[in-house]
Amino acid sequence: MVDDAGTAESQRGKQTPADSLEQLRMLPLPPPQIRIRPWWFPVQELRDPLVFYLEAWLADELFGPDRAMIPEMEWTSQALMTVDIVDSGNLVEITVFGRPSVQNRVKSMLLCLASFHREHRARAEKMKHLEKNLKAHASDPHSPQDPVA
């Protein structure tokens, strides 16, 4: 037989998710990430950025987790980019710095990739819906089974 003191003592060692969240809130915020202009990027091209918006889920597809692909994209395109979350996480603001021709090329490339990912997601959802319907049809005992030739 277990007494109440023993159970209370064993529960003290365990942390609930709420306790963990409180401990995280007590920690100081990390310092802001400071970006230094790369040596290959001219200062005068920081003056007139190109800004456009995409859905937040697309930013994860395009730039990878934690925006890890941005430095490589910047290097290959010779443009600087910032990706900031706006509109309570539904949209991201993409700012492209560089020569106007480079800005337009980067925007075009990102919009083409976004279109590809939208189509891919729509096809995946359509396939899931089709599979669900086929499983429901196959499990229905009243549906006539077509003989396979």
Curated annotation (Swiss-Prot):
GO terms for biological process: actin filament organization; embryonic pattern specification; establishment of spindle localization; establishment or maintenance of apical/basal cell polarity; positive regulation of double-strand break repair; positive regulation of double-strand break repair via homologous recombination; positive regulation of meiotic nuclear division; protein storage. Keywords: Cytoplasm, Nucleus. Residues 49-110 form the KH domain. It is found in: Cytoplasm; Nucleus. InterPro entries: KH_dom_type_1_sf, KHDC1, MOEP19_KH-like. GO terms for molecular function: RNA binding; structural constituent of cytoplasmic lattice. Residues 8-18 have a biased composition (Polar residues). The keyword Cell division does not apply. Residues 1-23 are annotated as: Disordered. One of its GO terms (cellular component) is cytoplasmic lattice. Component of the subcortical maternal complex (SCMC), at least composed of NLRP5, KHDC3, OOEP, and TLE6. Within the complex, interacts with NLRP5, KHDC3 and TLE6. As part of the SCMC interacts with the SCMC-associated protein NLRP4F. The SCMC may facilitate translocation of its components between the nuclear and cytoplasmic compartments. Forms a scaffold complex with KHDC3/FILIA, and interacts with BLM and TRIM25 at DNA replication forks. PANTHER family: OOCYTE-EXPRESSED PROTEIN HOMOLOG, OOCYTE-EXPRESSED PROTEIN HOMOLOG-RELATED. Belongs to the KHDC1 family. Component of the subcortical maternal complex (SCMC), a multiprotein complex that plays a key role in early embryonic development. The SCMC complex is a structural constituent of cytoplasmic lattices, which consist in fibrous structures found in the cytoplasm of oocytes and preimplantation embryos. They are required to store maternal proteins critical for embryonic development, such as proteins that control epigenetic reprogramming of the preimplantation embryo, and prevent their degradation or activation. Contains an atypical KH domain with amino acid changes at critical sites, suggesting that it may not bind RNA. This is Oocyte-expressed protein homolog. The gene is OOEP.
